[in-house]
A protein has these predicted regions:
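Accessory beta-strand-rich segments of carbohydrate-active enzymes
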Residues: 51, 80, 85-188, 193, ...
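Short, solvent-exposed loop/linker segments at the N-terminal edge
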Residues: 194-201
């Protein structure tokens, strides 16, 4: 369940968190809503240029693929055909262990950029598509994971012409794995606005909260 909470700050004042009556960022047991682990996810990907059948399958044999680290741009391998339509596949295997406390945390993959159109698969399951090559996109992959080895696959389609400048093709920016507690502030879930007054500025902070099933009763 997701909810929105608003805090207003006037000049020379400090308001307590309306969610708990405590300082922002903690629940009644002292656990931080913003407690998260950010791990760079750039190394040891496998890449293939071209379209292949069943490459999203976790049992697909990618031993002949090129091993790459991100950021990666496949167009630079053939500078005489920079604007040729093409498809690229990226695969990465990693080990996942649930939270040691027994609480199921949330696992988010953040792609800072994949040009041009991307489809993401986890353990063979198609989770979705992203059609905006220049913008960051996030996927909650928690429910598709299992303990032990897991396979992340991204299929990227490049079509030309699509830009007035050189765009590159592939996962051309960093990828992050982010682990969040069940109850957390979503990524990009804090919004601020200000209004000028005769005494200065009134600041409004809107904060989204994603509630875990065991988050307790908050008023």
């Amino acid at each position: 369940m997701r909810s929105l909470h608003r805090t207003q700050i006037k000049p020379n004042t400090c308001r307590k968190n309306k969610i708990t009556g405590q300082k922002p960022g903690s629940d009644r047991k002292g656990k931080n809503f913003d407690e998260r682990q950010n791990v760079i996810f750039d190394r040891n990907w496998y890449f293939y240029r071209g379209d292949v059948r069943n490459a999203e399958s976790p049992v697909y044999n990618d031993s002949a693929w090129r091993k790459v680290d991100l950021p990666h741009d496949w167009l630079i391998y053939d500078t005489k055909n920079l604007y040729e339509d093409s498809i690229g596949w990226y695969r990465k295997n990693f080990a996942y262990a649930p939270d040691k406390t027994g609480n199921d945390d949330r696992v988010i993959l953040r792609f800072e950029g994949g040009y041009m159109d991307s489809s993401i698969y986890v353990n063979g399951e198609h989770l979705g598509d992203w059609k905006y090559g220049y913008s960051t996109f996030d996927w909650d992959i928690t429910d598709a994971l299992h303990k032990g080895d897991n396979e992340i696959v991204l299929r990227v389609v490049f079509q030309a012409p699509n830009s007035r400048w050189y765009s590159g093709a592939g996962i051309y920016r960093n990828v992050w794995m982010i682990r969040l507690p069940k109850t957390h502030i979503p990524l990009d879930g804090i919004y601020t606005s200000s209004v000028e007054t005769k005494n200065g500025y009134d600041l409004t902070i809107d904060t989204e909260l994603e509630w875990g099933t065991d988050s307790g009763n908050y008023e």
